[in-house]
Structures are given as structure tokens and as C-alpha cells.
């Protein structure tokens, strides 16, 4: 493990959410379900996000309230972070508890992020429609399975 990763994990271990978490799996989650990328996005730490992404962290991991790191960046209004995540495969159509990252940015009043995301979303939707529909169906099936699993645990 690189010293840069170790520094990020040391900072995370300092929070109650990640106390005792084994970071031998880079996607290890804290008690609220967030992975390290959620946290560095929340911190606005672009350099740390790049380190985690290059180390193979899941950029689409749903954490607390089903927020992905992209939802967090959109909520916080960090345009540079949004661009970094999108450039590294963040799902523009990931749902949290009912909202897309675009909607999260719109509700938070981050118009610059909406202006960045809208044409990308339109381009994806206007592409090869059958492929897009199949991808959305697969994504929705995963979300339904996740929600059903969470209901079984209650």
C-alpha cells in the first residue's frame, strides 16, 4: 500500500465512522456505508480522490441514503470533483433515495454542475437507444434487489 493511501486511511481512522475498519479492501465501508471516496469527496480533497481512484476504488459505490460519491460532489457544489468522478466512470443515472446526481445538484442550487451534467446525460440518452434502455433496466434491477435486501433485514 502506498504511503499516500496510508495517509488517507489514517485520516479516516481518526473519525468515528471508520474506527476499526480494515482498509486492506480499498472499498471497505464505515458504519454509515460510505467508502473512503465518499469521505474525500465530502472533504473536497481532489488529490486524495485521484489517489483512491487510481488505486481502484469503486466510484459508483452507494453509501449512506444510497448516495454515490457523485451525489455527494453534486450536493456540495464541487464542480472539479464532479468532473473528476465523471471522467472516471461515475454513473450519471445513479439513484439515491429517488434522485439522480443532477437533481441533487439542482435542489442544492448548484447550476454550474447542472450545466455540466445536462449535455452529458442528453448525449447518453440520445445514443444507441436499445443499449441505453438495457443499461437502465440492468441498473434498476440492481437497485430493486438492493432495496429488497434492505427490506428483508428490517
Kindly give the residue locations of the regions a language model identified:
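Ankyrin-repeat-protein effector appendages
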Residues: 1-13, 106-154
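Ankyrin repeat A-helix N-terminal signature
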Residues: 10-13, 39-44, 72-78, 104-110
